[in-house]
């Protein structure tokens, strides 16, 4: 349930990012979504101690990747807050950064539990 909540927030943040990009007149790359799908598929090839199927290490890897993504998102919100605050006054960039901090804290707790199970 906690992971589902974080994932729902991440999806909401993606939609906000699209709106921010529109506000700034930044086009969305056609290649980046394709690259993300490719990276996700390649990530499945990563050795997790099992030839087939899902292992506890798989969950650990997934949580680590989520943490990396959320940390990057938090840095983006902070950077936009300091560089485009006037252009993006309709967005609460500080609150978005704080939400990312909360997401990181939740993911860290989940990561610790997954590590205990995996190691």
Give the ranges of each region predicted by the language model.
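Heptad-repeat amphipathic alpha-helical coiled-coil interaction surface used
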Residues: 7, 14, 67-70, 74-77, ...
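Long, charge-rich low-complexity segments
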Residues: 28-37, 104-119
């Amino acid at each position: 349930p906690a992971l589902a909540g974080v994932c729902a927030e991440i999806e909401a943040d993606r939609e906000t990012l699209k709106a921010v990009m529109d506000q700034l007149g930044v086009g969305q790359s056609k290649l980046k979504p394709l690259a993300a799908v490719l990276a996700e598929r390649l990530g499945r090839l990563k050795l997790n101690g099992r030839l087939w199927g899902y292992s506890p290490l798989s969950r650990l890897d997934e949580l680590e990747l989520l943490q990396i993504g959320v940390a990057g998102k938090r840095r983006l919100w902070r950077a936009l807050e300091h560089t485009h605050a006037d252009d993006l006054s309709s967005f609460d960039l500080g609150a978005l950064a704080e939400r990312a901090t909360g997401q990181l804290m939740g993911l860290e707790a989940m990561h610790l539990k997954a590590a205990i199970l995996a190691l």
